[in-house]
């Protein structure tokens, strides 16, 4: 009612473009988050062994991020293995991790509102046969995708200069 002639305009594209540009302070927050996540990842991998549960591993990650100064989980953290990885959206459970399981880690740490995260697979045994072929295929596809995306971003950035 204060501005009866005001026009409401969507500015999603403007905000997305502005959010791509990070200040030195924002980059420092992201780096600190990644530093903490790296410590948490190392601790989870050290503790991973057959018989531990997915939730126990999440607990280790949570303990580490808080001990090292994170204000919260940046994104929901999870540790999935085998059957739990069949769904795009799942939850860590009291499922015990098995001897030859492939375990998916996704860990994050929020620093001053910035939420970097790292996701990676860990194999609990020797990766052989069809499983190795499948993982190799996925790595090649993802590597190609990421390299293509990076090239596109660089070209777009260069043309905007």
Each model region followed by its residue ranges:
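Active-site neighborhoods and metal-handling regions in enzymes and metal-associated proteins
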Residues: 1-161
